Amino acid sequence: GFERPVLCDEKIFQFGDAIAIVAADTEEHARAAADAVKVEIEELPAYMNAMDAIAPDAAEIHPGTPNAFFETNCIKGPDFDWDSIPDSQQVEIESYCSRQPHLHLEPDCGYGYIDEDGMITVHSKSIGIHLHMPMIADGIGVPMENLRLVQNHAGGTFGYKFSPTNEALIGAAVKILERPVSLVFNQFQNITY
């Protein structure tokens, strides 16, 4: 969405956020170049579960957006008469579920180039290119009329591709390099990005 930068240049919001792009002519060269990259960061408080992140004294993660930005009620009928159950038979628990990755089988992949009309063209799987277009154009700093998104077969994304993933990274690399690029996430990157 609009709340996340394409590359986190000021703040890393979560494990797996992209902070740099390494582009090379072969995968071997790319891996060697990536190994040479050195990043200095100031470690911020890390919230390893949702309850810590929404605590009243928690630091704001996304500037201008509350950490608890969406709440829903659990509706399950009339209130239960707890007085009818002895205290010795009552228990109070607090629980939450961790983030569940979508675990689609095919890798997140795509490619991009500048076409004969001078448009940055990105091919990727998506289930909402009409939703992604303004986010990606804004993220890489090009007008929407200079960006073309082509939807490849999406397969079973299970919601993973409802938000843009690699498209902005591909578009940014094409814009900077002015040559064709491709990007294939491995399964670790699929889960953490």
Q: Can you say where each PLM-predicted feature lies in the sequence?
A:
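Structural alpha/beta core scaffold segments of enzyme domains
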Residues: 1-193
